[in-house]
Amino acid sequence: MKNLFKKYNKEKANFFVLGLRYEKPNKAEKYFCTPVGAKVFASMGMGGVHYCTVESFGETIFAVVPDSADGYVFPIAHDLAEFFSLIAELEGTQLLDQIPLFPKNIFENALKDHLAYADEERKAELAKFTKMFGVVAAKTPYETVMDLQNEIDISKIEFSKEYYDVLGIEKD
């Protein structure tokens, strides 16, 4: 995976239509809910949604969603290659952070609607993305993300003092 991260950091490519904006790790904006030890490498470019690895979780990719009502941090891929394959299958990041929140049938309906509105710009950007990084689309995105949800103990994620202050809760 280090080679894929190296290529990604070298290319610094943005795929705005796919909802993938390159973020320089040492300059990326972090939010109250960004985990301690997070290395932000990309964002959706809206809503504060960003993607990171967390030092204590190895190569696992997390989505951080500051305006979510059902938690703020979701593991979504085992590594960068899987993250990219999910983006390819879903034709963007727009539904990726929603998978943990939706029952499968609702997710599949949302995906069907999303794919039905694919325009030439999105198709061209997706082709460029898959070619640039040698991406093969994931065949079971819902199961991939949900299986990871069951593997990762998110209670082990460490948050900053600001996180607890914003939420008005005491740190254990």
Say what each PLM segment does.
Residues F62-P103:
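Compact, glycine/acidic-enriched structural inserts
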Residues M1-A69, H114-D172:
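A surface-exposed partner-binding patch
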Residues L95-A116, R122:
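Hydrophobic alpha-helical interaction segments
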